């Protein structure tokens, strides 16, 4: 007597149904409720497929008959093939014109990084890289042995796995393990029939040289793909070999998209009276850039050299080179009073600021900020709090105070 009949009811069969009757019932219901034919019956189709997968397996059926669905918990009943895979294996695929039979699966991609400089990305670069990979054995054509010598493993019926059932209290646990007779290969070859080149492994290791072209204008993180140059194995499509560009940080230029950014320092005289800056570009050119007298370059001002950026892979025009100017002021007391008087005549008149009439005024003197305090302020640390903490540390530090004498 069975504990539960739900799965039998799903297939509309008796609990004593034979495998042929189960198969016939599943075929009829699967065709009726397949989502390609009946789009609103997806859940029903999955329920039918699950019921058939369990009852078609003698071990699972015996466990279900004895303990019900509770006995299948942890036993892999829900870890089998999907409803679509079960349907495809049963009918061969291509039903209802909806799906084509599945082709061979694709192997794993091999991903490597290729380190480049910004100069490489500006000028382009070609490099050769050696790759060690598995390829189909040319001597046995991937069979692993003499033709006709490879047999399906009788112990696991060619699946490469075996199932063991354990009783754990009132529960039955069904576990999967690699078949020890074929080491998971699903096939066996007699030692005398093994291929001498690959020793039955079907593949051998081979060194391959790939020529990698880093095109002008490529970006950090961009991928260079070699289709199906990955490792080979019988029955699969080789994966791709993918090189990911890893750009080293540049000491002079920053890149954003197709644009370059450069930080230029000019002295105050050049900023006011004109002069010239020189920029070493990424292709060994030196750009001479005049600063027009009276142009008055301001601190942190941004200028642009159109078309001097990176070559664009998407547009015909290259990007721009943006130059951020930093004006370096002279040291204190750099000029005599007479020179300052001449400077005052040359510059626009100073703006005179004054307090409101009859306001209380107090004259103050500017002082230089302590370098340590400046760092704290730049890092948004309250200098008052920081100073207080330093004083506390000094008090706790190794300067003993007055101690009481023991009586």
UniProtKB/Swiss-Prot annotation:
Residues 405-407 form a propeptide. The record marks 329 as: Involved in dimerization. Substrate binds at residues 110, 129-131, 209-210, 241-243. Keywords: Chaperone, Cytoplasm, Lipoprotein, Metal-binding, Methylation, Nucleus, Prenylation, Protein transport, Repeat, Transport, Zinc, Zinc-finger. CXXCXGXG motif repeats lie at residues 137-144, 153-160, 179-186, 195-202. A lipid is attached at residue 404 (S-farnesyl cysteine). Residues 375-407 are annotated as: Disordered. Its main location: cytoplasm. The modification Cysteine methyl ester is found at residue 404. GO terms for molecular function: ATP binding; Hsp70 protein binding; protein sequestering activity; protein-folding chaperone binding; unfolded protein binding; zinc ion binding. It is found in: Cytoplasm; Nucleus. Zn(2+) 1 binds at residues 137, 140, 195, 198. A zinc finger (CR-type) spans 124-207. Zn(2+) 2 binds at residues 153, 156, 179, 182. The keyword Protein transport applies. Disulfide bonds: none annotated. One of its GO terms (biological process) is cytoplasm protein quality control. PROSITE patterns: DNAJ_1, DNAJ_2, ZF_CR. Homodimer. Probably involved in mitochondrial protein import. Plays a role in microtubule cytoskeleton organization. This is Mitochondrial protein import protein mas5. It comes from Schizosaccharomyces pombe (strain 972 / ATCC 24843) (Fission yeast). The gene is mas5.
């Amino acid at each position: 007597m069975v504990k539960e009949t739900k799965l039998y009811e799903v297939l509309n069969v008796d609990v004593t149904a034979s495998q042929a009757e189960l198969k016939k019932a599943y075929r009829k219901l699967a065709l009726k409720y397949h989502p390609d034919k009946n789009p609103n019956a997806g859940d029903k189709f999955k329920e039918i497929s699950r019921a058939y997968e369990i009852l078609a397996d003698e071990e699972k059926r015996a466990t279900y008959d004895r303990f019900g669905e509770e006995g299948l918990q942890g036993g892999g009943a829900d870890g089998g093939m999907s409803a679509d895979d079960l349907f495809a294996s049963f009918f061969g695929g291509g039903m209802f014109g909806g799906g084509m039979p599945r082709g061979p699966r694709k192997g794993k991609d091999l991903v490597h990084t290729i380190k480049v400089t910004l100069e490489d990305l500006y000028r382009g670069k070609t490099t050769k890289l050696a790759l060690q990979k598995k390829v189909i054995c040319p001597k046995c054509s991937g069979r692993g042995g003499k033709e006709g010598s490879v047999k399906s493993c009788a112990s696991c019926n060619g699946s490469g796995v075996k199932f063991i059932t354990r009783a754990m209290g009132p529960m039955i646990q069904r576990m999967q393990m690699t078949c020890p007779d074929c080491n998971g290969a699903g096939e066996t070859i007699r030692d005398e029939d093994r291929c001498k080149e690959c020793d039955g492994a079907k593949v051998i290791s081979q060194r391959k040289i790939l020529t990698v072209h880093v095109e002008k204008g490529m970006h950090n993180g961009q991928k260079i793909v070699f289709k199906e140059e990955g490792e080979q194995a019988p029955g699969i499509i080789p994966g791709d070999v993918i090189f990911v560009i890893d750009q080293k940080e540049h000491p002079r230029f920053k890149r954003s998209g197709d644009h370059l950014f450069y930080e230029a320092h000019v002295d105050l005289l050049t900023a006011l009276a004109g002069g010239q800056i020189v920029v070493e570009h990424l292709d060994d050119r030196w750009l001479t850039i005049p600063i027009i007298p009276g142009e008055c370059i301001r601190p942190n001002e941004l200028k642009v050299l159109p078309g001097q950026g990176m070559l664009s892979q998407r547009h015909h025009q290259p990007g721009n080179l943006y130059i951020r100017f930093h004006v370096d002021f002279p040291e204190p007391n750099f000029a005599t009073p007479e020179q300052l008087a001449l400077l005052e005549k040359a510059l626009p008149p100073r703006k005179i600021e004054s307090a409101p009439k009859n306001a209380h005024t107090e004259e103050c003197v500017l002082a230089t900020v302590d370098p340590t305090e400046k760092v704290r302020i730049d890092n948004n640390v309250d200098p008052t709090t920081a100073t207080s903490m330093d004083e506390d540390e000094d008090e706790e530090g190794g300067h003993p105070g007055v101690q009481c004498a023991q009586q």
